[in-house]
Amino acid sequence: MSTPIEAAWQLAKTRYAGLNIDVEAALKQLDQIPVSMHCWQGDDVAGFENTGGPLTGGIQATGNYPGKASTPDELRADLEQAFALIPGPKRLNLHAIYLESAQPVARNEIAPEHFSNWVAWAKRHQLGLDFNPTCFSHPLSADGFTLSHPDEKVRRFWIEHCQASRRISAYFGRELGTPSVMNIWVPDGMKDLTIDRLAFRQRLLSALDEVIAEPLDQTHHIDAVESKLFGIGAESFTVGSSEFCLGYAASRGTALCLDAGHFHPTEVISDKISSAILYVPRLLLHVSRPVRWDSDHVVLLDDETQAIAHEIIRHQLLNRVHIGLDFFDASINRIAAWVIGTRNMKKALLRALLEPTETLRKLEQNGDYTARLALLEEQKSLPWQAVWEHYCQRHDVIPGSEWLQQVRQYEETILTQRQG
């Protein structure tokens, strides 16, 4: 006797077959698309340097939900709990401040040995790792500048930090057999009117050239640069603007990172993918949810998340676009935040894979925009949820909202025992 989920799955296959959509092929392709989940949702971007300093760089984690991770083992345990509730392939994105060392380590002296536990853990769980230098929350970034700093000594420190980070990233890729994407984002900018914008950008250009000068095997490591419109305390001028980073990636052959919250509120990165990909070899996406500013709310299955997935799938860009998430909400259960956001990204990818894209494309090419719109809207009502639930069961993952019960149980037995 079939279960309701199995019965719905069989009906869904029949419905989609009527539109010439191979559901099995879609699920097979979904199994080839990893989503890189960010570690910093688990501890509000605190890291393990244990300096006691505040989060800086024009970003904020708001809320004080109990039970956040404060040690590497706690964070890994929380990640395992989240991963168990997310179907399909996954990666983990680490920042440099998540190193492990018995003694304090200067950021320009970090080395692969400080991340060996993460690599061993990733091997056990069949995960790829991605990386980021951490150019904020540090005394030498307190005045708002790092790689573009006018003081050569300060600038040198951050150049060395990014160079060390690249070697760690390459170590990840070498050990795990999948390239690590290392994204460089700097908070450099000014609160008020800036006279010599060119000098700051010339210094950033030169510094980045030094950072990426060491040749590294691209099967192990991929460089990316990320722009931003503004941050708290850098409202008037951001050195690494969109034009700067696009120009840098295009001229140096790096990947370009598009963060959903790093542009003007009326802009969306889904519209930028098909333009930027014409000029850069790869894109890194930071899928997020900006609410009036770069607030990094948990990703929803909303129009923009769906549009991002459509752009990747419609244009067959999976081999050139790396999908990562970037949000941190300290007002709700942090494990639930991971699960909600990552499942939503995967749901959006599944829906994109189930779209009758070739039919829609032919309608567009023939100028039949009436039929294009009608079909676009009607296919939203197709039974993709039945396919999703079947996919979850294939991966031994709870298909519906019942996963929250596991999170609540973990919260009661583990998170409530933590201090702070």
From Swiss-Prot:
Gene Ontology terms describing biological process: L-lyxose metabolic process; rhamnose catabolic process
GO MF annotations in UniProt: L-rhamnose isomerase activity; manganese ion binding
Keyword 4Fe-4S in record: no
Chief place of localization: cytoplasm
EC number(s) stated in the UniProt entry for this protein: 5.3.1.14
InterPro entries, sorted: L-rhamnose_isomerase (IPR050337), Rhamnose_isomerase (IPR009308), Xyl_isomerase-like_sf (IPR036237)
Domain of life: Bacteria
Pfam families (alphabetical): RhaA
Catalytic activity, reaction form: L-rhamnopyranose = L-rhamnulose
Annotated metabolic or biological route of this protein: Carbohydrate degradation; L-rhamnose degradation; glycerone phosphate from L-rhamnose: step 1/3
Cofactor binding, per record: Binds 1 Mn(2+) ion per subunit.
Transmembrane segment boundaries: none
Keyword Isomerase (UniProt): yes
Residue pairs linked by disulfide bridges in the UniProt entry: none
Annotated HAMAP family: RhaA (MF_00541)
Its job: Catalyzes the interconversion of L-rhamnose and L-rhamnulose.
Record text on subunit structure and interactions: Homotetramer.
PANTHER family: L-RHAMNOSE ISOMERASE
Protein name: L-rhamnose isomerase
Highest classification ranks of the organism: Bacteria, Pseudomonadati, Pseudomonadota, Gammaproteobacteria, Enterobacterales
